[in-house]
Amino acid sequence: GFYGILKAMDGVVPYRLEMQAKLPAAGCKNLYDFWGSRLYFELTQNDKSILNLASKEYSKSIEKYLTLRDKYITIVFCELSGDKLVTKGTYAKMARGEMVRFMAENSIENPEDIKKFDRLGYAFRHDLSSDTEYIFERRIEITSY
């Protein structure tokens, strides 16, 4: 949230600043207020397609500006816990990074090709996904001793 939109070779310094953190500078109450619609317009100036790999906290900075012309696909990484699919934060964060690597290594530009992602035990779930939300389930191997 602090740096805005970054390019592949942009340098950053490690920091921990959440989007909803109070921001007394520039008359803004938080980073959502500071960035306003600028992040959305930067993302959509050349293409109206957005693949959302961000956490819910960061997604909020874009979603409220979406229009009907935008193609917005949210990626969800989850696993079965009891009889429910749940997102486990640490694994989801690892999977988001791994998906970016997968897309870069395979020069992926078509959203359909993202469905081939199969790293870290995740597989695309056709039955749970839609045109706007791609669900990837992590299969956990249960080892008995």
Question: What is the predicted role of each segment?
Answer:
Residues 1-130, 135-145:
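Internal, well-folded beta-alpha domain core
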